[in-house]
């Protein structure tokens, strides 16, 4: 990729690149779940959705990583890969229907943010509370 160095220095991957990932169906395949055909009509041309699996996700990640830019990898699939799965697995149906298509098509971005007011032990002590919250959301 000829512009990776400039993108790294700017600390931003152009929105058009992320959009292209969505148009090619790559974003829909990077969630660690079955290919969500109900939220997008975009498909990876070489693999039908019903045959898509984690191996294919690994191939995409490996190919993006060949650029040698951690900034590009994290800019394209880092936050998306961390923030997208909880939405699609645990999010309320109305929320997924409203946000999901734009995420999968590359029109919007997502990330998972965890704040730590003090230090790391605060978060590790909070895991039970977080698990309880997720369980309540699923019921």
Task: State the predicted function of each range.
Residues 90-139:
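Glycine-rich, Trp-frequent "lid" loop and neighboring beta-strands that shape
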Residues 38-40, 82, 120-121:
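Short secondary-structure boundary/hinge segments and terminal tails
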Residues 71-81, 107-116:
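Core alpha/beta catalytic barrel or barrel-like domain that forms the active/cofactor pocket
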Residues 60, 83-87, 113:
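Adenylate-forming
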Residues 1-77, 94-98, 102-105:
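Amphipathic, small/basic residue-rich leader segments at the start of a protein or domain
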Residues 72-94, 123:
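N-terminal glycine-rich flavin-associated loop
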């Amino acid at each position: 990729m000829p512009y990776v160095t400039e993108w790294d220095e700017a600390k931003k991957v152009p929105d058009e690149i992320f959009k292209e990932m969505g148009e090619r169906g790559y974003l829909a395949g990077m969630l660690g779940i079955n290919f969500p055909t109900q939220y997008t009509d975009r498909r990876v041309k070489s693999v039908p959705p019903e045959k898509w699996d984690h191996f294919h996700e690994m191939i995409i990640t490996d190919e993006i990583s060949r650029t040698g830019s951690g900034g590009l990898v994290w800019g394209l699939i880092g936050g998306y890969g961390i923030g997208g799965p909880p939405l699609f697995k645990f999010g309320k149906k109305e929320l997924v229907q409203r946000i999901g298509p734009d995420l999968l098509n590359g029109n919007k971005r997502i990330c998972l943010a965890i704040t730590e007011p003090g230090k790391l032990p605060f978060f590790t002590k909070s895991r039970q509370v977080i698990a309880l919250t997720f369980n309540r959301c699923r019921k």
